[in-house]
């Protein structure tokens, strides 16, 4: 009997997939859950659920450190935001797929399975990475059988699959952020209720006193918060805690999915927003004007590649090479004031700063103003010629 490794969360979709793979595909099912910073119970529950449903074997893979260092920190270094969102779900998918491939190779499996539907982004993200990392077959039972939510529930009851507790919202959570969708949130005319948020306080409940956060960067990566040196996972968690407590990081947006659907999405990404904001401010102190323009274009393109699941696209690796070189100078300290949902960079310093106080001072003669006369005279020469042509 051939083996299949199923990316397993313990939710309805992947729970139904276990039985479908055994019944419809006649395969030995190995389930695997990859820990990228989910709540502890979301790591423990899949193992118990897999055993109850009848998985032949289960793996739990701790990938938090790799996710923080190689993926979340890459988001910071590139300031990558897709339509204003720091890609907490999208950055996790290629790592999860990579770990599933590693298990499949270890088990000599012929196939990898996932529980994605045919309407979402994750089918593209998972399968693009799986195909780049291996020649294994891929199946997606829920999509392949075109199952609705109700049909999945009926199938689960018929096959004795314990139904997960009914949730109003679909929630995906990892170290870098939480995404909340479904239920009444599907109507963009309906305000998101306070109950959906767990990481962030409302502006009403946030502290009355502003908090100043000091973040130190080395080569573009955050290394200290408030002078405390922290490993990547701990640093991100600290940033989430501080920013979330001050009402930072709520995003309510209508997002353009890969297949063209518009989807109402709610996110909590307090630490990501704080760290990216501080990092971008430091870059503006250090980079030249042309570097800043280029970095903005790089950020947008990088975010598109990650969102679209193109982690193994050669261009992404090319951009990493350029970005890593630029980040060698992004070393310094930034202070950010947080207060009731607002965030403002108040100080920044770096040994690589291109800012020259002497040159910009109103009191200092670092630059002889008279030398500007000739430069200003011919500034916008083409604009002047264009206006002359119009007049004639």
From Swiss-Prot:
Any Gene Ontology CC annotation: cytoplasm
Question: Its Gene Ontology biological processes?
Answer: argininosuccinate metabolic process; L-arginine biosynthetic process; urea cycle
Q: Does the keyword Secreted apply?
A: no
UniProt main location, coarse: cytoplasm
Q: Which Gene3D superfamilies match?
A: Argininosuccinate synthetase, chain A, domain 2, HUPs
Enzyme superclass (EC)? ligase
What residue intervals traverse the membrane? Answer: none
Q: What EC number(s) is this enzyme filed under?
A: 6.3.4.5
Q: Which residues bind L-citrulline?
A: 85, 121, 125, 170, 179, 255, 267
| Protein's cellular compartments | Cytoplasm
Ranges in a coiled coil: none
The pathway to which it is assigned is:
Amino-acid biosynthesis; L-arginine biosynthesis; L-arginine from L-ornithine and carbamoyl phosphate: step 2/3
> Keyword set for this entry?
Amino-acid biosynthesis, Arginine biosynthesis, ATP-binding, Cytoplasm, Ligase, Nucleotide-binding
Q: Which residues bind L-aspartate?
A: 117, 121-122
**Reactions catalysed, as given in the entry:** L-citrulline + L-aspartate + ATP = 2-(N(omega)-L-arginino)succinate + AMP + diphosphate + H(+)
Q: Name one GO molecular function term.
A: argininosuccinate synthase activity
Q: Where does ATP bind?
A: 7-15, 115
* Keyword Transcription regulation appears in the UniProt entry: no
Q: Cross-referenced CDD domains, in alphabetical order?
A: ASS
> Could you tell me which NCBIfam families the record lists for this protein?
argG, PRK00509.1, PRK13820.1
State the similarity comment: Belongs to the argininosuccinate synthase family. Type 1 subfamily.
Q: How does it assemble?
A: Homotetramer.
What this protein is called in its record is: Argininosuccinate synthase
